[in-house]
UniProtKB/Swiss-Prot annotation:
This is Mitogen-activated protein kinase 13. CDD domains: STKc_p38delta. Its EC number is 2.7.11.24. The TXY motif contains the threonine and tyrosine residues whose phosphorylation activates the MAP kinases. One of its GO terms (molecular function) is MAP kinase activity. One of its GO terms (cellular component) is cytoplasm.
């Protein structure tokens, strides 16, 4: 392989895996590995900044892997918002399409994620600032026509200045596409996803934000279901068992008859459920943890809630300049065809200066 490596690249083992990097990225250090790839940190010699580099594992193993890799590349490239992870660079050591087997994605480096710091006690001010950033990121993602669908503490990256970026679009889909299969870790998953009981839209992500915010307030997972039914039971204990108006909207007959078989119960009082929460925090949670998707807040609506008044800057609540183009999403292409599309994207990639907010909260984790 060394004979066909591009000039200006060097090879190094990172966590027992061979990485081939441009000489501009030095000191690669293993950060973590997942099902679809591994991540290391490195220093970009040009800027002196620390970056995260992701090497996808076997991106061309099958059509499904190749399509997933293509979608991840395109989504990262499309997202240009300070609260959404975006692409700084993409490269391959291959000198031509013929020897193209691997590629690497370069993103901003974030020190930790919300999952790792969930044990700490969050002040209301910190919760305001972090949840505000989640919603700004979601407003932007949703305006591009994309639903994240896998929002959980583990894919909300934060740095020591409490700046947050939404990560991991591995399972994100275009809002109009048919939504199927295993998506969000069950505990953060909206009830309409768990049961496919009614149409669903971008507010599935708002339900997840509600679950995450509740966990930040109490230090405990809000709905820790052992299985689907237990998850629903725990949700209904908090939201109450809905009445006829809601049941009429359900598409699923089994879900309909199950809900009708339960005694109707009112919603819990959120100020009692979350004694640490201010009245405004409890009110926002109530509006995000709404069973009926037609009544649940959108990201744009949630941002206008008085809870965020201390940090709100409408100029930072931007939308995507254009919708995400997933015209190849439904194409049945071969691995070689996906490979060609990815290679073309890499060759034609030109980095965009990413505008992060210069406004600092002065807050530390």
């Amino acid at each position: 392989m060394s004979l066909i490596r591009k000039k200006g690249f060097y090879k190094q083992d990172v966590n027992k895996t061979a990485w081939e990097l441009p000489k501009t990225y030095v000191s690669p250090t293993h950060v973590g590995s997942g099902a679809y790839g591994s991540v290391c940190s490195a220093i970009d010699k040009r800027s002196g900044e620390k970056v995260a580099i992701k090497k996808l594992s076997r991106p061309f193993q099958s059509e499904i892997f190749a399509k997933r890799a293509y979608r991840e590349l395109l989504l990262l490239k499309h997202m240009q918002h300070e609260n959404v992870i975006g692409l700084l660079d993409v490269f391959t050591p291959a000198s031509s399409l013929r020897n193209f087997y691997d590629f690497y994605l370069v993103m901003p480096f974030m020190q930790t994620d919300l999952q790792k710091i969930m044990g700490m006690e969050f002040s209301e001010e910190k919760i305001q600032y972090l949840v505000y950033q989640m919603l700004k990121g979601l407003k932007y993602i949703h305006s591009a026509g994309v639903v994240h669908r896998d929002l959980k503490p583990g894919n909300l990256a934060v740095n020591e200045d409490c700046e947050l970026k939404i990560l991991d679009f591995g399972l994100a889909r275009h809002a109009d596409a048919e939504m199927t299969g295993y998506v969000v870790t069950r505990w953060y998953r909206a009830p309409e996803v768990i049961l496919s009981w009614m149409h669903y839209n971008q507010t599935v992500d708002i339900w997840s934000v509600g679950c995450i915010m509740a966990e930040m307030l109490t230090g405990k997972t809000l709905f820790k279901g052992k299985d689907y039914l237990d998850q629903l039971t725990q949700i209904l204990k908090v939201t109450g068992v809905p009445g006829t108006e809601f049941v009429q909207k359900l598409n699923d007959k089994a879900a309909k008859s199950y809900i009708q078989s339960l005694p109707q119960t009112p919603r819990k009082d959120f100020t009692q459920l979350f004694p640490r929460a201010s009245p405004q925090a409890a009110d926002l949670l109530e509006k995000m943890l709404e069973l009926d998707v037609d009544k649940r807040l959108t990201a744009a609506q949630a941002l206008t809630h008085p809870f965020f008044e201390p940090f709100r800057d409408p100029e930072e609540e931007t939308e995507a300049q254009q919708p995400f183009d997933d015209s190849l999403e439904h194409e049945k292409l071969t691995v070689d065809e996906w490979k060609q599309h990815i290679y073309k994207e890499i060759v034609n990639f030109s980095p965009i200066a990413r505008k992060d907010s210069r406004r600092r909260s002065g807050m530390k984790l």
